[in-house]
C-alpha cells in the first residue's frame, strides 16, 4: 500500500507484509531467576538479528544495584590485615563485590553490618532497610577466628554495567573509605538460539529461543521487556515519517476488506466436540469473536486446554487468521454482513 506523508510517498508493504511473531511464549520451567522464551514466527534472519541485539542490550544496559564503597571499622585501606580475621582486607573487599542487592529508590543508601561473634560473617548479617534487600544472604564476607567485634558501612547505589572504582562520581575519597569496582548488571547470563519455524506449509521462517539468567532483582520477563524498549527508543530516530498516520491508513484499508472467514460460525470449523463445546460455553459463536481473544484468555476458559488451543490455532492459520486480532466495530460489520446475506438469499 502506498500512502502520502507530506511530500513523501511511503510504501507500507516494506513492513506490513512481513510475518510477525504472534506472542512471546514463556517456558513453564521459568522462575524468578531463570526465564526461557520462544518467539515465532520471524522472517528468515530476523531470529539472529533480534536475538543478538537483545542479548547485547541485556548484558550492557540493565539497571541494577551494587555496593560502591565500604568503610570497615579500624581499617584505613584495603592493603592490610585485621587481627583475628582469617581473610585479608583485599579478600574481604572481593567478597563484598559478590553481594547482590535489590533497590527500590534511586537515592544512595547506607547499610550497616555489626557483629560480635566467632565464625563466619555473611551478607545475612547486613542490616537491611525498607529500600534495599540483600539477594544472596549466604555470601561469605569474612571468617572470625575468635569472638570479636566487626563493623562495616556499605554505600549502595543504582547504575548499569561495570564501573571501575576510579570512575564513580560523587563519592567521598578519604582514609578508611574504600571505593569499589562495581558490577551493577542484574543479568548473569543470556543465551539464544535460532531454529526453523513453520507458517502454513512454509518452513523457511525463524524461531527465536532466548534464555535469561538474573540475580533476582529483576524478573527475566521484565528484563526482556526493558531491553526491547531500549532498542525501540534507540531505533525510533531512524524513522523519517509519521508512523501514526501510516498505521491509520493501513487500518482504513483493512476495514474495507475483512477476511470473509471472520463471519463463519464455530460449527463450520469442524473442530473436536470438546473444543466446540468450550467455545460455545464461552459464548463464542463466530470466528470473528474468537480471534479477538488472546491465547492467554482462552487458556483461562473452563475445560479449555493446550490441546484445544493448538487445534484451533492450526485452523486459524489455514484461514490466515490468528488470536489477538483487533477488529474495530466488528459487531456492526457483522450485522451489515448478515443483512447483505439475507438480501442475497431473498
From Swiss-Prot:
Q: What class of enzyme is it?
A: transferase
Query: Where is the stretch described as Alpha C-terminal domain (alpha-CTD)?
Result: 258-346
State the Gene Ontology terms under molecular function.
Answer: DNA binding; DNA-directed RNA polymerase activity; protein dimerization activity
Query: Which stretches are annotated as coiled coil?
Result: none
Q: Does the keyword Nucleotidyltransferase apply?
A: yes
Question: Which reaction is this enzyme known to catalyze?
Answer: RNA(n) + a ribonucleoside 5'-triphosphate = RNA(n+1) + diphosphate
Q: Where is this region: Alpha N-terminal domain (alpha-NTD)?
A: 1-242
Give the domain of life. Answer: Bacteria
GO CC list: cytoplasm; DNA-directed RNA polymerase complex
Q: What is its EC number?
A: 2.7.7.6
Q: Name one GO biological process term.
A: DNA-templated transcription
Which UniProt key words apply to this protein?
Answer: DNA-directed RNA polymerase, Nucleotidyltransferase, Transcription, Transferase
What does this protein's UniProt record list under function?
Answer: DNA-dependent RNA polymerase catalyzes the transcription of DNA into RNA using the four ribonucleoside triphosphates as substrates.
Q: Show the domain comment.
A: The N-terminal domain is essential for RNAP assembly and basal transcription, whereas the C-terminal domain is involved in interaction with transcriptional regulators and with upstream promoter elements.
Describe, as the record does, how this protein assembles with itself and its partners.
Homodimer. The RNAP catalytic core consists of 2 alpha, 1 beta, 1 beta' and 1 omega subunit. When a sigma factor is associated with the core the holoenzyme is formed, which can initiate transcription.
Q: Which family does it belong to?
A: Belongs to the RNA polymerase alpha chain family.
State the protein's name.
DNA-directed RNA polymerase subunit alpha
Gene encoding it?
Answer: rpoA
Amino acid at each position: 500500500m502506498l500512502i502520502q506523508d507530506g511530500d513523501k510517498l511511503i510504501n507500507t508493504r516494506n513492513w506490513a507484509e512481513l510475518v510477525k511473531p504472534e506472542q512471546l511464549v514463556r517456558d513453564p520451567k521459568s522462575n524468578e531467576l531463570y526465564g526461557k522464551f520462544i518467539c515465532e514466527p520471524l522472517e528468515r534472519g530476523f531470529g539472529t538479528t533480534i536475538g543478538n541485539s537483545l542479548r547485547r542490550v541485556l548484558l550492557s544496559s540493565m539497571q541494577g544495584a551494587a555496593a560502591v564503597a565500604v568503610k570497615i571499622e579500624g581499617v584505613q585501606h584495603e592493603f592490610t590485615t585485621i587481627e583475628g580475621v582469617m581473610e585479608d582486607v583485599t579478600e574481604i573487599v572481593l567478597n563484598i563485590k559478590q553481594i547482590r542487592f535489590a533497590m527500590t529508590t534511586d537515592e544512595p543508601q547506607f547499610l550497616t553490618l555489626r557483629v560480635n561473634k566467632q565464625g563466619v560473617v555473611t551478607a545475612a548479617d547486613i542490616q537491611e532497610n525498607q529500600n534495599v534487600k540483600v539477594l544472596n544472604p549466604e555470601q561469605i564476607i569474612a571468617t572470625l577466628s575468635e569472638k570479636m567485634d566487626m563493623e562495616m558501612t556499605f554505600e549502595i547505589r543504582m547504575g548499569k554495567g561495570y564501573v571501575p572504582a576510579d570512575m564513580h562520581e560523587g563519592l567521598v575519597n578519604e582514609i578508611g573509605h574504600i571505593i569499589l569496582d562495581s558490577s551493577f548488571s542484574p543479568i548473569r547470563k543470556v543465551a539464544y538460539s535460532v531454529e526453523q519455524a513453520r507458517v502454513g506449509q512454509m518452513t523457511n521462517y525463524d524461531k527465536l529461543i532466548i534464555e535469561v539468567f538474573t540475580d533476582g532483582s529483576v524478573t527475566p520477563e521484565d528484563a526482556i521487556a526493558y531491553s526491547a524498549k531500549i532498542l525501540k527508543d534507540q531505533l525510533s530516530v531512524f524513522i523519517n515519517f509519521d508512523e501514526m498516520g501510516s498505521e491509520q491508513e493501513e487500518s482504513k484499508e483493512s476495514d474495507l476488506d475483512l477476511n470473509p472467514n471472520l463471519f463463519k460460525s464455530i460449527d463450520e470449523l469442524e473442530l473436536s466436540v470438546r473444543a466446540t463445546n468450550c467455545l460455545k460455553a464461552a459464548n463464542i459463536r463466530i470466528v470473528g469473536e474468537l480471534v479477538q481473544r488472546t491465547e492467554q484468555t482462552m487458556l483461562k476458559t473452563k475445560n479449555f486446554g493446550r490441546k484445544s488451543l493448538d487445534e484451533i490455532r492450526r485452523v486459524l492459520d489455514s484461514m490466515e487468521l490468528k488470536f489477538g486480532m483487533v477488529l474495530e466495530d466488528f459487531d456492526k460489520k457483522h450485522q451489515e454482513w448478515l443483512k447483505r446475506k439475507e438480501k442475497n438469499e431473498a
